[in-house]
Amino acid sequence: MIKWEEASVIEIPKDVKVGLSGTMLSMTFGNKKLEKKFADNYVRLLVEDNKIKIVKSKNNSRERGIVGTWASEISNMVKGLKEGFQYEMKIDYSHFPMRVSVKGKTVVIENFFGERSPRTAEIVGETQVSVKGDRLFLNGPSKKDVGETAANIERATIIKGFDPRVFQDGIYLISKGE
């Protein structure tokens, strides 16, 4: 018989609805919904009232690491539903003015270093991207999706074969505004 011991307890606000179906944890607040799979053989989730308990059957460094990671991810899900995450990026160029626009689920970067073909970056999940002057604002309930979208935009403006200390054109993350 496996003995499960309680490793961590996360308090959930009363207005956030929590559901656990197998290993899939879903949270709903208003019209926002987040789902994440938490699967492991030695660490499990239990939902009781307005608490999520993380229990483990082994006590070694791997399981302690998983417990801490899961606790952080669950608290980020709650924070994302209640407040959201906002990142700010700056459009930086020296000679050729970049035109940045949002078309559907992609960010289109035109006239980067005078290139004729536009560069594109994918918008991940429910992330909202808006362009105001030389700033890009990324908002969304999932920290992972907002961060991945910011990385996609920054990666789309990498210049291969040039010294980045000299050629500093690009779109860079300046604030995580958490």
UniProtKB/Swiss-Prot annotation:
Q: What is this protein called?
A: Large ribosomal subunit protein uL6
Functional summary from the UniProt entry: This protein binds to the 23S rRNA, and is important in its secondary structure. It is located near the subunit interface in the base of the L7/L12 stalk, and near the tRNA binding site of the peptidyltransferase center.
Instruction: Kindly give the Pfam families that the UniProt entry links to this protein.
Output: Ribosomal_L6
**Cited PANTHER family:** 60S RIBOSOMAL PROTEIN L9, 60S/50S RIBOSOMAL PROTEIN L6/L9
Q: What GO molecular function annotation could you give as one example from this UniProt entry?
A: structural constituent of ribosome
- Which family is this sequence assigned to? Belongs to the universal ribosomal protein uL6 family.
For this chain's UniProt record, which GO biological process terms are given?
A: cytoplasmic translation
User: Does the UniProt entry include the keyword Ribonucleoprotein?
Assistant: yes
Cellular component, GO annotation: cytosolic large ribosomal subunit
Keyword list, A-Z = Ribonucleoprotein, Ribosomal protein, RNA-binding, rRNA-binding
Gene3D superfamilies per the UniProt record, alphabetical? Ribosomal protein L6, alpha-beta domain
Does this UniProt record's set of keywords contain Ribosomal protein? yes
List the coiled-coil residues: none
Quaternary structure annotation from Swiss-Prot or TrEMBL: Part of the 50S ribosomal subunit.
